[in-house]
């Protein structure tokens, strides 16, 4: 092909496929004002040395594509080197990376991870601990030591430690603690000694920065980033891994999944810094930090265009599978489920013993599905399709190709400032009033400078994205983003809490005192991830449980409880008695204000609290949970004692119930007494547990 013209990128709508040609219509492309919109173009695919790595056979009409690094010939055919399917559907970098394993690459790994629950184990705890070590060393470089860091980690996730069967035995726990100390020593030494040798500016490092790309359809949170503007130097990425490198370890190789994760971070940083792939070698240095190995912990690698094409083609295949769920077709979804098997996932020769173990794990999903009855399969598939559609709306919202208005996460880059203003979906023109991000408070107080911000659709506890404002708010995804939570919101000020404490305020100060910032609401995948796994757990449940959920069997009754409270009406007594007499479940439905919480729940708790049975009380929203907490306290005569354990965070819990959070309960004990036995004792002494469905669902060990 003789090159005639080059175009950096295009956002297009796929109209029709004709063999190796995609007939597309150009759409408005962010930051590119010179693009002719609604122009019909022909895109050539499956071309050797250009884009043959991309399999476009299963692309569907009226889908969005993002084309990058495009060449045009004299006949006006477009030859993109990168083709991204449904770029507004952001996939986590780590989820894509899991498709690349030592035993082969397969998009079905994504579905496997999506559906099969992962039990709490020591490897997860160790990885979590290693990340805390980094946080502690950067935020408290002088005062940090292993004992305090290990204790702090235990206090931050006491339930996880107490319910982890891998370390239940004392000797196993001591071995785990020793492993943690080894990781601590190596991480601290690398940060204090090796980082300077790599040219990493410790004072400029940012922890856990978030980036999203509406071009590549990915989002990711890096562990450590030393960001340099394109003209000023080299950006350094450090991704921490507490697991093992490839076996056998040659001292420089990186596991496929870790390598892919690192390469996708290259994409995110290159977009933020406006780099082309030819500049990566000189402008980005990425490292995997293996904290388990004794030597050669830091391993560097730079991706090639061919590898990036392979990675993004796998991302496209994941999206194709997700689109099958959206069609709500039982036969198509069932056919896809049958593709999740060891033959499609294990593609390389591995040791027979390991192959057998791995195949058993992989095939467990399909085998469970096959053993299920027809009605159970249909229930599973129907809800899988339904949840997938809701998840899609959460990410992209309801939009069409003509105006592309979105109400999901994609609204951040698809909707303009005026549209966000009309829906009160943005707080903008904020300036920093007080910065405490480098203190234990981990907060910033912003002052509102625009009168249009008097009204907004935000409240305390909302999870948001914070980003530095440019002149027209159009380049949001070209910035580093901070995930935060609104701690308080007032007429003139808004205070936000950050998950990660930073070493200093240098990043924020680099923009100047008058720099303006914006807040928009974030959308989380975690609740949906729990729903997918719960669906598979339904197939694994006992037969009686499945039959009750499917209403094949009627809920059973115990003997008449004979409840009677002279202070209640006959109808209220009847309802409570039926609930107490139920063996399996009891459904109470009624409009707001009819006393479901203030009377029925309150008196049910009052009756059951002396039975020594554990009671789990759930609601959808934190506000509803707080109302339930009020009702529980009322059933105890508003005693000041700890009457229940509340699951959640400080910011999501009403002030008067924060003392019931487990971390605050154990905070009343001295550090010398802190132990798993203490946690068990606290939990055993309490019989009432309260939280949102999401908070309980995300913590299955509870």
Regions found by a protein language model. Name each.
Residues 2-232:
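Metal-dependent nuclease catalytic cores that hydrolyze phosphodiester bonds in DNA/RNA
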Residues 571, 582-588, 612-613, 687:
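Pre-Walker A (Motif I) flank of P-loop NTPase domains
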Residues 605, 611-702:
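Conserved P-loop NTPase motor core of helicases/translocases
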Residues 1-25, 127, 131, 306-458:
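A helicase ATPase "motif cassette" and its flanking acidic/Ser/Thr-rich regulatory loops
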Residues 582-606:
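Walker A/P-loop
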Residues 106-109, 289-323, 455-577, 633, ...:
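Pre-ATPase regulatory/linker segments immediately N-terminal to the P-loop/RecA-like helicase/translocase core
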Residues 27-60, 202-316:
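Mg2+/Mn2+-dependent nuclease catalytic core
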Residues 21-23, 30-54, 391-544:
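Conserved ASCE P-loop ATPase motor domains encompassing nucleic-acid-directed helicases/translocases
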């Amino acid at each position: 092909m003789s090159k005639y013209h080059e175009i950096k990128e295009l956002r297009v709508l796929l109209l029709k496929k004709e063999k190796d040609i995609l007939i597309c219509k150009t759409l408005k492309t962010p930051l590119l004002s010179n693009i002719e919109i609604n122009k019909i173009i022909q895109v050539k695919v499956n071309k050797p040395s250009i884009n043959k790595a991309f399999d476009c056979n299963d692309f569907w009409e009226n889908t969005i594509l993002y084309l990058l690094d495009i060449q045009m010939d004299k006949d006006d055919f477009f030859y993109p080197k990168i083709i991204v399917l449904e770029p507004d559907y952001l996939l986590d970098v780590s989820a894509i990376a899991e498709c690349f394993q030592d035993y082969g690459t397969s998009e079905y790994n994504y579905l496997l991870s999506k559906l099969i629950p992962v039990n709490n184990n020591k490897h997860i705890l160790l990885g979590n601990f290693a990340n805390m070590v980094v946080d502690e060393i950067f935020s408290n470089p002088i005062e940090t030591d292993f004992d305090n860091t290990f204790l702090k980690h235990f206090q931050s996730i006491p339930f996880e430690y107490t319910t982890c069967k891998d370390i239940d035995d004392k000797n196993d726990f001591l071995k785990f603690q020793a492993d943690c100390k080894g990781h601590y020593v190596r991480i601290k030494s690398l940060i204090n000694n090796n980082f300077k040798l790599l040219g990493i500016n410790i004072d400029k490092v940012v922890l856990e920065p978030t980036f999203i790309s509406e071009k590549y359809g990915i989002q990711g949170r890096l562990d450590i980033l030393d960001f340099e503007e394109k003209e000023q130097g080299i950006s350094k990425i450090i991704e921490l891994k507490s697991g093992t490198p490839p076996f056998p370890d040659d001292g420089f190789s990186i596991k496929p999944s870790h390598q892919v994760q690192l390469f996708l971070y290259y994409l995110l940083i290159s977009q933020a810094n406006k780099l082309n792939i030819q500049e990566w070698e000189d402008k980005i240095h990425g490292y995997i930090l293996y904290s388990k190995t004794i030597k050669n912990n830091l391993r560097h690698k730079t991706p090639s265009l061919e590898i990036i094409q392979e990675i993004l083609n796998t991302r496209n295949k994941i999206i194709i599978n997700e689109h099958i769920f959206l069609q709500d077709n039982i036969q198509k979804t069932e056919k896809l489920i049958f593709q999740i098997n060891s033959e499609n996932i294990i593609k390389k020769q591995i040791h027979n013993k390991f192959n057998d173990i791995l195949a058993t794990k992989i095939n467990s999903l399909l085998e469970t599905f096959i053993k299920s009855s027809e009605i159970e399969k249909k229930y599973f598939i129907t809800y899988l399709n339904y949840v997938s559609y809701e998840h899609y709306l959460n990410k992209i919202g309801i939009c069409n190709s003509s105006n592309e208005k979105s109400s999901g996460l994609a609204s951040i880059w698809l909707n303009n400032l005026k549209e966000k203003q009309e829906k009160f979906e943005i707080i903008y023109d904020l300036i920093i009033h007080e910065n405490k991000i480098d203190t234990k408070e981990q907060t910033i107080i912003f002052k509102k400078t625009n009168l249009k911000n008097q009204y907004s659709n935000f409240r305390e506890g909302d999870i948001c994205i914070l980003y530095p404002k440019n002149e027209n708010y159009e380049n949001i995804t070209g910035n580093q983003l901070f995930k935060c939570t609104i701690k308080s919101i007032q007429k003139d000020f808004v205070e936000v809490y950050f998950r990660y404490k930073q070493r200093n305020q240098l990043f924020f100060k680099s923009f100047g005192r008058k720099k303006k910032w914006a807040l928009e609401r974030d959308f989380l995948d975690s609740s949906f991830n729990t729903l997918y796994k719960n669906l598979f757990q339904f197939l694994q449940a006992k037969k009686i449980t499945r039959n009750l959920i499917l209403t094949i069997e009627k809920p059973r009754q115990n003997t008449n409880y004979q409840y009677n409270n002279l202070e209640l009406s006959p109808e209220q007594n009847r309802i409570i008695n039926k609930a107490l007499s139920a063996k399996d479940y009891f459904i109470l439905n009624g409009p707001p204000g009819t006393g479901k919480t203030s009377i029925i729940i309150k008196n049910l708790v009052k009756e059951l609290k002396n039975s020594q049975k554990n009671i789990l009380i759930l609601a959808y929203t934190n506000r509803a949970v707080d109302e339930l907490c009020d009702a529980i306290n009322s059933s105890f005569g508003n005693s000041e004692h700890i009457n229940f354990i509340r699951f959640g965070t400080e910011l999501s819990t009403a002030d008067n119930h924060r003392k019931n959070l487990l971390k605050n309960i154990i905070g009343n004990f001295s550090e010398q007494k802190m132990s798993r036995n203490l946690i068990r004792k606290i939990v055993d002494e309490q019989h009432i547990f309260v939280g949102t469905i999401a908070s309980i669902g995300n913590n299955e060990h509870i």
